[in-house]
Amino acid sequence: MRHRKSGRHLSRTSSHRKAMFQNMAVSLFEHELIKTTLPKAKELRRVAEPLITLAKEDSVANRRLAFDRTRSKEIVGKLFNDLGKRYATRQGGYLRILKCGFRAGDNAPMAYVELVDRPVGGSVEPAE
């Protein structure tokens, strides 16, 4: 029985899941819009939203925690200098998940994950 067990396994080992969501979070913060499967998108929320909440209070300790979770100095800079300030007054719900049909190969449900209030300009291709 899996009573009170949170999270999805996604047919991966725990280390693979951790690395995958770390990479997906970095891609999301870099491009501000990514396309992935719906179950991965829903799990990505649990990784990405706490990082934005962490970035709302700029301190050395919080920057080190963010670097530990993303392993990217550029993304840590963007989190604290741009995204933390952008969402300073928002109490959560920084991501929007939009369903976008099914993948051709295996009919998996697909979704766009985007940052709410992101600047919209030109033709932006989502990161896959």
Curated annotation (Swiss-Prot):
PROSITE patterns noted in UniProt: RIBOSOMAL_L17
Q: Which UniProt keywords apply?
A: Ribonucleoprotein, Ribosomal protein
SUPFAM superfamilies, per database record: Prokaryotic ribosomal protein L17 (SSF64263)
- Any one GO molecular-function label of the UniProt entry: structural constituent of ribosome
Please give a single GO biological process term from the UniProt record.
translation
Q: Which domain of life is it from?
A: Bacteria
Q: Which Pfam families match?
A: Ribosomal_L17
Q: Which Gene3D superfamilies match?
A: Ribosomal protein L17
Q: Which GO terms describe its cellular component?
A: cytosolic large ribosomal subunit
Q: Which InterPro entries match?
A: Ribosomal_bL17, Ribosomal_bL17_CS, Ribosomal_bL17_sf
The record's subunit annotation is: Part of the 50S ribosomal subunit. Contacts protein L32.
Name the family the entry cites. Answer: Belongs to the bacterial ribosomal protein bL17 family.
NCBIfam families, per the entry: L17 (TIGR00059)
Q: What is the protein's name according to its record?
A: Large ribosomal subunit protein bL17
